[in-house]
Amino acid sequence: MDLSTILGLVLAVASISLGDILEDGNPLHIIHLSSVIIIVPTSLFAAMTGTHARYVKAAYKEIKIVFLNPKINLNETIKNLVELATLARKDGVLSLEGRVAQIEDDFTRNGLSMIIDGKDLKSVKESLEISIEEMEEYYHGAAHYWETAGETAPTMGLVGAVMGLMLALQKLDNPAEMAAGIAGAFTATVTGIMCSYAIFGPFGHKLKAKSKDIIKEKTVLLEGILGIANGENPRDLENKLLNYIAPGEPKKSQFEG
């Protein structure tokens, strides 16, 4: 569970509510059903219009990444690659054939299968790089959907406010009802801005940020697979791959006690 996502959402709503309460307001008055209906679905539908269908599907499929941390452990990934490099250097690349069948990750399995089959390194590298590029495009397309919804929401809030004002002005003969209608109209603006900057926009930014971690793992795997194919010294390969671990994160070497 990514607590920063949950805390961010909760604290954003709490901050707005607290500010309203300090001015003797009632946060529940901000929740206006008609405003929510005008803004939320319309923003999502508008984003759908401007996003390729496969990325719309990806946006909802991968939204879980915003709330859950991807199962990525670069130290473990590097450890596995170094073990494979050690085995390949000792017994040859063909000795990896039995291990490849046990690997769950398609990217790793495909890469190792290609070098076991004797494909030239240039072809292996190009194939894996294309796979990484497509994966990056996939996640960026999904993030684009949520970012577009975030960009659209404030405008939909203005649409809701204008519609509310139009209805309120029809009640000029009843000042009390007109005032209530005007107040209700402006809740649409608040709802649109909140949806944009506290929900949809952050969803897109978080999805894009986390996709970078996924792409980094695939890049480490690519470098490791090419190192295995080149017969690199396992220690040298490990030193190179450990550089991909972010500063401040622990780096675990198999060759240190």
From Swiss-Prot:
GO biological process, one term: proton transmembrane transport
Keywords in alphabetical order: Cell inner membrane, Cell membrane, Chemotaxis, Flagellar rotation, Hydrogen ion transport, Ion transport, Membrane, Transmembrane, Transmembrane helix, Transport
Chief subcellular location: membrane
Cell location: Cell inner membrane
Transmembrane segments: 3-23, 28-48, 149-169, 180-200
Described purpose of this protein according to its UniProt entry: MotA and MotB comprise the stator element of the flagellar motor complex. Required for rotation of the flagellar motor. Probable transmembrane proton channel.
Protein name per its UniProtKB record: Motility protein A
Gene symbol of the encoding locus: motA
